[in-house]
Amino acid sequence: MSEAESESRAGREEVWIEKYRPQTLDDVMGHENIVGRLKSYVSRNDLSHMLFSGPAGTGKTTCATAIARELYGDDWREHFLELNASDERGIDVVRDRIKNFARTSFGGVEYRIIFLDEADALTSDAQSALRRTMEQFSNNVRFILSCNYSSQIIDPIQSRCAVFRFSPLADDAVAEEIRTIAAEEDIELTEDGLDALVYAADGDMRKAINGLQAASVSGDTVDESAVYAITSTARPEEIRTMVQSALDGDFTASRATLDRLLTEEGIAGGDIIDQLHRSIWEFDIDDDAAVRVLERIGETDYRITRGANERVQLEAMLASLAQGE
């Protein structure tokens, strides 16, 4: 194996989401307003407690680590503690780690940062306990809480935090980053491969980068087929065909497409529901039909999340659409 091949292989084995994670706030893509506010905090060295809310892969963890890097320089890891609030060992273990970190000498810095991920996974009682912990150490610790849904964070915590709402990244921002990484890793990325990565990611940069790395393992060319296979994502036209067949009254054809997606392509029922919801306004249907499809999607999603059989519920949804219900 040549030296160049060895370097390329080593690069493929490294996790790209960490390798290409932005190091400073200026490097963060797609959130200019949020970055501007955060830079203002950092420039004054006057952080408040913060709540980062938004979907996965939109830059919440990246912004937290970038803040620490800019405040503490090369020693940032000594003054930054990252925890997962849904740690299976419970909030008591999390609180113990917070206390130990907060009580440790911190070499001249005014405060340290604790980044608490998945804070919305905590029960209301656990969040109340967390609020008391935040108050106890507010003099020398700043908390950055991360969640998918701010509505699941109790008001007493929200009122103590500056809230930043991260939206899914724009397709252009995701595409730009994917092109950059592909060039850096010497990956031949086709245009349809890029489009597929952007579609599969749906604003989630982490998913796009992971998809690129996984698809590149099978060869140096990443095209549409490789992306859809590795990300377990249905092609948009397959979703469109499945729904249109049902709306046209052809349940058999619609069910055949569903069966292929579930069985041959191994796509989860929940993911099919998500893609249906994303794609509904791309279908050539009137508003009344769109409303009917959305109602069926909502009912099916609810039943699946409650534990019902995915295939049965999806087939029932298609049958309902085929009957004009």
Curated annotation (Swiss-Prot):
UniProt-listed GO biological process terms: DNA repair; DNA-templated DNA replication
GO molecular function, one term: DNA clamp loader activity
Positions with a binding annotation for ATP: G54, P55, A56, G57, T58, G59, K60, T61
GO cellular component: DNA replication factor C complex
UniProt keyword Nucleotide-binding, yes or no: yes
Alphabetically ordered keywords of this record: ATP-binding, DNA replication, Nucleotide-binding
The keyword ATP-binding belongs to this UniProt entry's keyword annotation: yes
Listed SUPFAM superfamilies: P-loop containing nucleoside triphosphate hydrolases (SSF52540), post-AAA+ oligomerization domain-like (SSF48019)
InterPro entries reported for this sequence: AAA+_ATPase, ATPase_AAA_core, DNA_pol3_clamp-load_cplx_C, DNA_Rep/Repair_Clamp_Loader, P-loop_NTPase, Rep_factor-C_ssu_arc, Rep_factorC_C, RFC_lid
SMART domains reported in the protein's UniProt record: AAA
Function text: Part of the RFC clamp loader complex which loads the PCNA sliding clamp onto DNA.
Family: Belongs to the activator 1 small subunits family. RfcS subfamily.
Quaternary structure and partners: Heteromultimer composed of small subunits (RfcS) and large subunits (RfcL).
Protein name, per record: Replication factor C small subunit
Source organism (scientific name): Haloarcula marismortui (strain ATCC 43049 / DSM 3752 / JCM 8966 / VKM B-1809) (Halobacterium marismortui)
